[in-house]
Amino acid sequence: MSQTHPVMKYVQEKGQGFGARMLNHMPGMAQEALAKALDYPYIYPDLDPFVKCLMAIQLKQGKSSFIHEDVAKARVDFIQQMKAIQGKPTPLKMVEDIRLPLHSGTIMARHYHPAPQKKLPMIMFYHGGAFMVGSLDTHDEFCRLLAVHAKVQVLSVAYPLTPEYSPLQIVQVCEDALAWAHQNSKTLKIYKNRIAVAGDSAGGNLATVVAQHSVGKSYAARAQLLLYPVLDFKSRHPSFYAYKEGLVLSEEDVNLVSRLYVENHQMALDDPLVSPTYGNLKQLPPTYVITAQHDLLHDEVSIYAHKLRQHGVRVYHKNYVDQTHGFINLSPISKRAKKYVIEIARDFRKFWDKRN
């Protein structure tokens, strides 16, 4: 019978969050050695060694995916996993949960404001989670950091999830939320009606689709912040095959999402409602794009950024060469991830404020 590695035993006894914070304080070389000792089987020389350790531990625990067929269980598991790594939240002057009475139905949202007495621009944020998991709580720390360091209000939207809801229904709610914020800009103290859309992964997909749908409307998004968004269910690019295993997002995950979100709702894989890379790219607002090198979505996002430039859209594309999909969620336990999130927040605001 094989013995449990001491680190695995420590993580099991102390909990994932405590164990991850302990790993975060180890030197990079020690993290590399630990990942090797835990038999991490993949060769990704430039990947953050802290992430390698986390992935090695996940594999040792028999977890190769963060979602699975049992959607109800996947939701509970994801919430528990995110709760386990949460630390003390970044302080903010105002954080409140509010109800949005939309045309498509009432939903919850979380409003973050770093200076409630001031008028500030707003970012509408749509959380990631493969369209089927995730919540206001799972992305709370990211939204706090974004509000503080971009000096903006953030409205995080609790949109309905698949498979219970179709892409059309989900997108409609997300677009209605943007329209609601615009209609209530005076009450919300939104500076000069400046409202951007943002999201990570599946949320980045929704932000992209909403931005496309809002072009020419009174509530059109003024900017986009897209963090490793899902943009193309139809095509497979080199990064898909290079990084399809042993990381946060796997080929297995993408195939499951494709089936539950797209195919089960009788959508074509290249329908712009689910694959916005095939949508109308004219007159889109300035777009700040984030990719992680070790992400199977890397190439499709890079291609989209290139397409936007070809259509005259002002684009800034930042690639984090040592990161993988989902790294913004590691900010509570990773000094490097937190540094990157703060950098993204500050640089996005500078980009947004810059004149053409």
Regions found by a protein language model. Give the residues of each.
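A glycine/proline-hinged amphipathic helix-loop "lid/cap" segment
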Residues: 1-111, 353-356
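Alpha/beta-hydrolase superfamily serine-hydrolase fold, recognizing
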Residues: 6-24, 42, 94-356
